[in-house]
A protein has these predicted regions:
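Conserved Switch II/interswitch segment of TRAFAC-class P-loop GTPases
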Residues: 69-74, 84-106, 111, 115-135
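Conserved G1/Walker A P-loop phosphate-binding module
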Residues: 2-69
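Alpha-helical scaffold elements adjacent to nucleotide-binding pockets in ATP/GTP-utilizing enzyme cores
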Residues: 27-30, 102-109, 135-143, 167-175
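Residue-level signature of catalytic and energy-coupling elements of molecular machines
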Residues: 21, 27, 46, 66-68, ...
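Conserved nucleotide-binding/hydrolysis micro-motifs of P-loop NTPases
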Residues: 72-73, 96-100, 115, 124-129, ...
Length: 655
């Protein structure tokens, strides 16, 4: 079967949602002719408590996967697991009862899981008169108006009489077609690896272990070797079913995999299958979190450190929601970037959606999308990290790649970027082409390897190389040079051999260093040159100290001191590294003492103004021109000494 033919088979998952006893299973039986209740207890109780799966043929000829999830409040976990991977939701609402608690809860879950297409099936119309049906439609319309499903079509139907079923199928076909292109796009990601959250695991006599789930990210084929997390069970795919035997399944399809390998019989719901080294698990991640509060209870804030159940894929782990440093508790309806700390590992990738339940009693309280699947243990974000999360939240891949590179201390490979951000290498390469052409990212080639670095990070690495060589020559004035390993270890202790070689090659191309034979050296390493630079540093600092906050621009400093360009450049580099001077503009620097004095003046002015002051007040306190004052104030903002509140009319306060 060709991939094009398989696409017409089922890359879209349709799932039901709705309150208990509103007729979801009966509706599916009317649509498909099959009863989704697969457990004896379900048939006896007349409700779905586990996950029912099947297929649905639409009028256009498309065959889509169908998921029926439980509506009872006690089975919220099963509902979340079943809703994971749904592309189009069928919200089932009884025309007799209208919107009920689990109706609301299920819609919230669908929003949190990123579902955007919905059809509302107004069921049991055979038990309601025209007025009741109209009231139910108004009730549904009013509820959905505050959600992403505000435009969802509402179709009255009766599973018992068959009235409206054909119309429902036609509308559902339209919704499936609306998300068809996106489903095709996920199939065509050539550099992705498959992931399968396991929602069922059972044994078939004569075949062995079978697991089912919704396939994510990439195709899987017979013969593929997979690994399960967190158990790390290694297995091989012996057979695949997608509404019948097939050699290959596509992402977005409901699949059953027949697995062979040691330990496969112990696999269970909650584990995730994937390609070893192409996916991982985490104990900490960053996410965009929407706090819903608890349905039907008095609204209350969410405190940092709240213990919760985190559900992603089909897994559930206990953890804590950590608000960022200095943030107030979350009010109901708020959306923020938060850190989630888990008590056990959770298989997760950036872009996945997670649902959060309160610890006890277990109730839906929120969820959202994962921004970064692995992060450091800190609630205080730097400006660079905030820029990274803003880019990831907006879906700006190039911005996210650039922001992540700006946070690294050394060059990295495209694979490093892809692993950190859970992107395909092709996506990273496309983003890097634009960043390199803009000049914000530099590419370093050594042999067959390509390394990448933020331009500012690379400049800092070159500064470190220059300072290291200067120090090594000063400590060993008789040495003509040093081994690359010794230089790299001193300049960049964390660099591996490949990164070190790339940085030294870059240093040679810039004239920062030179290499001859097995030695690396400063081409200007004569003792006299070193003394000249030291003396230049002393004279520059003395001049800047005397000038205070009204220091001349750096080219004028060089002219006044009669320093040649090379000496001036080397002196400024050394002074910046040892923090004797502080640049407030590209061509303006203050001595460390002057910058400290500026801080004192600004702090005093802000305190005198009652905790916040305008630029005009601060300029008067600094006693310099408006242009210089703005440069100094923006520098103090950048180093997090002050903070500018644009919404408050440009007032600055101390951090």
């Amino acid at each position: 079967m060709s991939e094009a033919e398989a696409l017409e088979e089922c890359p879209v998952i349709v799932g039901t949602a709705g309150h208990v006893d509103h007729g979801k299973s009966a509706l599916i039986e009317a649509l498909t002719g099959k009863n989704p209740d697969r457990l004896e207890v379900e048939r006896r109780r007349g409700m779905t408590v586990e996950l029912g799966f099947g297929e649905l043929a639409l009028p256009s000829g498309k065959i889509v996967g169908l998921v029926d999830v439980p509506g009872h409040a006690h089975y919220l976990r099963a509902m979340v697991q079943g809703a994971t991977g749904i592309d189009v939701a069928v919200l089932v609402v009884s025309a007799v009862e209208g919107v009920m608690p689990q109706t609301r809860e299920h819609v919230h879950v669908l929003e949190l899981l990123g579902v955007t297409h919905m059809v509302v099936a107004l069921t049991m119309c055979d038990l309601a008169d025209a007025e009741m049906i109209e009231l139910a439609e108004l009730d549904v319309d009013d509820f959905l108006s505050g959600t992403v499903f505000a435009e969802a079509p509402i179709v009255p139907a009766s599973s018992k009489t068959g009235e409206g079923i054909d119309g429902l199928l036609a509308v559902l076909d339209e919704q499936v077609s609306a998300c068809w292109d996106a489903c095709r796009d996920r199939v065509e990601r050539s550099d992705a690896a498959p992931r399968l959250p396991i929602d069922r695991c059972f044994t078939i006599k004569g075949a062995g272990t079978v697991v089912t789930g919704t396939l994510h990210d990439a195709p899987v084929a017979v013969g593929d070797e997979l690994m399960a997390l967190p158990s790390r069970t290694v297995c091989r795919v012996r057979g695949i079913q997608v509404h019948g035997d097939t050699p290959r399944a596509l992402p977005g399809q409901r699949v059953a995999l027949n697995l062979v390998g040691d330990g496969v019989s112990a696999l269970d719901r909650g584990e995730m299958l994937g390609v070893a080294d192409r996916f991982g698990q985490t104990l900490r991640f960053m996410m965009t979190f929407t706090y819903l509060g608890r349905e039907g209870t008095k609204p209350r804030v969410l405190e940092s450190g709240a213990r919760v159940h985190v559900m992603a894929g089909t897994a559930e782990v206990v953890g804590r929601i950590m608000l960022l440093e200095g943030e107030a508790p979350m009010a109901v309806g708020e959306t923020r970037t938060v850190q989630v700390r888990l008590e056990d590992p959770l298989p997760l990738c950036a872009g996945d959606h997670a649902v959060v339940l309160s610890y006890s009693p277990v109730m839906l309280i929120g969820g959202g999308r994962v921004l970064l699947s692995r992060c450091r243990r800190s609630r205080e974000l730097s400006a660079g990290e905030r820029a990274l999360f803003a880019a990831l939240e907006s879906g700006d891949t190039a911005g996210g790649v650039g922001a992540w590179l700006a946070l690294q201390m050394l060059p990295v490979t495209a694979v490093d970027v892809a692993d950190a951000l859970d992107l395909g290498v092709g996506e990273v390469d496309a983003a890097l082409r634009g960043l390199v052409s803009q000049g914000s990212v530099r590419k370093l080639a050594v042999g067959d390897a390509d390394y990448l670095a933020d331009a500012v990070v690379l400049d800092a690495a070159m500064d470190a190389l220059a300072a290291t060589l200067s120090a090594m020559h000063a400590a060993s004035p008789k040495e003509t040079g040093f081994t690359p390993g010794a230089v790299a270890h001193a300049a960049w202790p964390a660099a591996d051999d490949g990164v070190a070689a790339a940085l030294i090659a870059e240093g040679c191309s810039r004239g920062v260093c030179a290499a001859e034979g097995a030695e690396v050296f400063d081409p200007h390493s004569a003792a006299a040159a070193a003394r000249v630079v030291r003396e230049a540093c002393e004279r520059i600092v003395a001049l800047l100290d005397e000038a205070g906050l009204d220091a001349p621009i750096l080219p004028e400093v060089g002219e006044q001191l009669q320093l040649d360009r090379d000496t001036m450049t080397r002196a400024l580099r050394e002074l910046s590294l040892n923090r004797s001077i502080v640049k407030v503009e590209c061509d303006v620097a203050l001595s460390a003492a002057a910058e400290a004095h500026a801080r004192e003046l600004v702090a005093a002015a802000i305190e005198a103004a009652g905790g916040a002051a305008t630029t005009s007040v601060l300029r008067e306190a600094l006693g310099v021109s408006r242009k210089r004052a703005i440069s100094i104030l923006e520098h103090l903002d950048a180093v997090r000494f002050t903070v500018l509140d644009k919404e408050a009319g440009g007032l600055r306060s101390l951090r």
